[in-house]
A protein has these predicted regions:
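N-terminal module-boundary/linker segments of secreted carbohydrate-active enzymes
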Residues: 1-15, 20, 146, 154-157, ...
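Aromatic-lined carbohydrate-binding/catalytic grooves of carbohydrate-active enzymes
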Residues: 4, 17-131
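Residues in flexible loops and secondary-structure boundaries
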Residues: 7, 44, 58, 164, ...
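Generic recognition of stable, solvent-exposed alpha-helical segments in well-folded globular domains
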Residues: 16, 59, 63, 134-137, ...
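A generic structural signal for short, solvent-exposed coil/turn residues
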Residues: 26-28, 148, 169
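Short secondary-structure boundary/capping segments
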Residues: 49-51, 92-94, 138-142, 170-175
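Glycan-recognition surfaces
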Residues: 104-107, 154-203
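Extracytoplasmic, non-cytosolic globular domains
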Residues: 118-121, 125-154, 158-162
Length: 203
């Protein structure tokens, strides 16, 4: 949802995206993931538990994943390896401040992957970059928290805007290799060309 909407998302919008994926034949073509990116964060309570944005997702996040699953699709969610999200930095979204995984790794993974039942997680790096954290060590900690949930079917995406290194293939199912894609052929072509030498690291 980030490429078009940034943090301006809602339960209704995500539901419509899921429906469009099915009715336009994309599900039959093999496209199965509906990913909720930055913008669903509301606040952490006194225990540190994350709550969904009350205006954008008034029914919480579990009904969203349930609806996506009811259409035979997979549900994806977002977080940041640091303490603040990309939306808090680039969109001035105050709800993203303190909403990252830093210091809440196990708590958030249990919530997102078990209680809310999401199947995919994109882990951004805007907040972690600001903190000067070491990439491989940071993602290792987060992936351990994911394993501790008992979920073995979760797809992990490392979002680092460049190929993170050969270590990524042992942790994640996918990873970013470039800056954000743009809705024009030159951007798509650029990313295809960057993949030429990176295909050896895929599985």
């Amino acid at each position: 949802s980030w490429n078009t909407y940034h943090v301006n998302i809602s339960e209704d919008l995500i539901r419509k995206q899921a429906e469009a994926l099915v009715t336009n034949g994309l599900k039959d073509a093999g496209y199965l993931y509906i990913n909720v990116d930055d913008g669903f964060f509301g606040h952490r309570d006194e225990t540190g538990k994350m709550h969904a944005h009350p205006g954008r997702f008034p029914n919480g996040m579990r009904p969203v994943s349930d609806y996506i699953h009811s259409l035979g699709l997979k549900a994806g969610i977002y977080s940041d390896a640091g303490d603040n999200t990309c939306g808090s930095i680039y969109d001035d979204d105050a709800n993203g401040v303190g909403s990252g995984l830093y210091g809440h790794e196990q708590q958030d993974m249990d919530l997102y992957l078990k209680e809310w039942n999401y199947d995919f997680i994109k882990i951004d790096y805007c907040g972690a970059k600001e903190l000067g954290l070491e990439e491989e060590k940071r993602y290792t900690t987060i992936c351990e928290a994911i394993r501790n949930t008992g979920r073995t079917d979760v797809s992990i995406n490392i979002c680092r805007w460049a190929f993170p290194g050969t270590w990524a293939k042992d942790m994640a199912r996918s990873w970013r290799i470039s800056s954000d894609i743009r809705p024009r052929w030159s951007s798509v072509k650029h990313i295809i060309e960057k993949n030429l030498y990176l295909s050896a690291y895929g599985r």
